């Protein structure tokens, strides 16, 4: 049986629980490579228009081409050709044929870059780092394979030089493919 006291108790305002005090965030002074990467990312965000494109693509012919080229590239470089290098080659060729996409901003000017320098996002312990494959449009698949594998290894070992992280005109990632 429900009595008047039960109804009144139910209707009484509920007191809010105490809000915990905000914790002060930890601040870590950046230096060295981490600072250089942050500076490059900030400059990139300010000067290069950002566009993200995700597409479904039938890669059947690319898979077949890679299978045929694997032994050739590996015998020339000592590295296995991955889809990353094929994507870099395709993007570099496209940017060369569409130079207005290979552009950046400098103040009130649009800069059409003559070099096609592809930034490759590489997962490292503390996040991502983006080494730059210089003049990717002038490299064949074997040279792109050697360059990207070397830069990726140096990135994971924290041995990239600042110049190896500068100058990208376009950045890609294949999301772990």
Question: Where do the language-model regions lie?
Answer:
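C-terminal catalytic/motor cores of large multi-domain enzyme assemblies
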Residues: 1-177
């Amino acid at each position: 049986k429900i009595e008047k006291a039960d109804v009144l108790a139910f209707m009484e305002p509920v007191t809010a629980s105490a809000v915990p005090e905000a914790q002060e965030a930890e601040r870590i002074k950046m230096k060295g490579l981490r600072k250089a990467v942050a500076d490059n990312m900030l400059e990139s965000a300010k000067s290069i228009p950002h566009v993200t494109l995700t597409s479904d693509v039938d890669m059947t012919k690319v898979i077949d081409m890679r299978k045929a080229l694997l032994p050739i590239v590996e015998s020339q470089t000592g590295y296995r050709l991955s889809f990353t290098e094929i994507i870099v080659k395709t993007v570099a060729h496209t940017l060369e044929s569409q130079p207005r996409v290979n552009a950046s901003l400098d103040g009130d000017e649009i800069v059409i870059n003559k070099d096609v320098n592809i930034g490759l996002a590489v997962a490292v312990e503390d996040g991502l780092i983006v080494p730059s494959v210089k003049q990717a449009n002038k490299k064949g698949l074997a040279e792109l394979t050697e360059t990207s594998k070397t830069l990726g290894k140096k990135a994971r070992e924290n041995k990239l030089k600042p110049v190896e992280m500068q100058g990208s005109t376009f950045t890609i990632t294949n999301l772990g493919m």
